[in-house]
Amino acid sequence: MRNAIVCGSGVAGLSAAIALASKGWSVNIYERSSTVREIGAGIFIKGNGLRVLEGFGLLDRIRRDCIVLREARTLDKNGNILQQRLLHESNPVWNIQRELLIRALLARATELGARVHTDSSVDAISLDGRVSIRGSQVGAELVVAADGANSVARHALGLDRSARKPLSGAIRVLVPRSSHEAENIVREFWSGRLRVGVSPCTATEVFSYLIAPLNDQRGARTPIETEYWAARFPRLAAEGLFQRAAVEEGVHHRYPFVSASSWTRGCVALVGDAAHALPPTLGQGAGLSLMNTLLLSHYVSSRSDVPEALAAWEHDWRWVSNRTQIWARRYDWITSEWPPSVYALRNAVIWAIGKSRRFNGYMRVADRVDALSRKVLPAPRFTLQTGEPASNGSTG
């Protein structure tokens, strides 16, 4: 039986374990924490990730706990619609609590025979598949490094590459759902260099994210400053969102970005944030991890030479993640670094982006990857309902 070591038990690590174990590999997962858990609030899963979860036999289990969104809207601070996109089977978006997703993945991985070792931090990794775990040596034919944006493996193998970090961060929080979120619609409000997203993620809870530049101390503070956010988003203030969020436990994270010189070296592959951490502006953090780990399992399971298989995997598929990273950063730039003197022009840009099917198909290429068949599907003819851009009197 072929054997693999997976370093990390987040979405990428557990997905890699499921994909490999389902193809007959013996898999050991090493997690540095005392438990397998996910810190955060909600997480969006799009078509590429949903197809992987279906292949894992998890889609029905996930559906019981998630919200299937039917529409995505971008609005200015007063609630005027800048962009509106209907969501359906050809471009689906689901929202689920991160912890529930992790539990489902963990259960499936262990059902398939993967073994999880907690309190097992990785000290060092070698090209030949040897891994030092708290001073003890273990080895495998394949090592999958899913150890996050600050990856020990990436650094140890000399795969770090300098990259300009995003200048934004987000507070993520779960709040009680109210009548204002009765519909299964994700809404994102823009005001200057701030953004607030609101999306139902269970029948009783809403996932909200509050985005601000890192140098905005009041915007990055937790618990959130109700008055600060309410003054900049009057529509959401009227809905009582900030009062609800202020009493909940939110977590602030700087937007990540990783640019590795290579995803592979020897018998080691970087996956998830260790390979391609990116701002969450396109909702593809989980999707890329699920997609790339399943693709990786196809390559290493169909070839006897692991380094050769890993090189082919990266050659054939890295471009999707690269493009997604580029456009996720550009989308964040529109918020965090757009010149205030031309905010009215920004509204027109958002409107134009939403109106172009061809551009959306290019920017959102990751949504269309079917890792099961190893194909990129045709761009969906999703329904855009953009009206006219907001007037120059709105500063969005």
Mark where each language-model region is.
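C-terminal helical "tail/cap" subdomain of flavin- and related membrane-associated enzymes
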Residues: 1-2, 90, 283, 298-396
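Conserved N-terminal helical subregion
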Residues: 2-4, 21, 46-157, 161-178, ...
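Active-site substrate-recognition segment that forms the wall
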Residues: 186-218
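Conserved Rossmann-like nucleotide-cofactor binding loop
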Residues: 12, 35, 150
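Flavin-binding catalytic cores
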Residues: 219-252, 306-307, 315, 319
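Conserved mid-domain beta->alpha element of the FAD-binding
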Residues: 9-22, 30, 145, 249-335
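Glycine-rich FAD pyrophosphate-binding loop
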Residues: 21-41
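Conserved hydrophobic helix-helix packing surfaces used for dimerization/oligomerization
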Residues: 4-6, 27
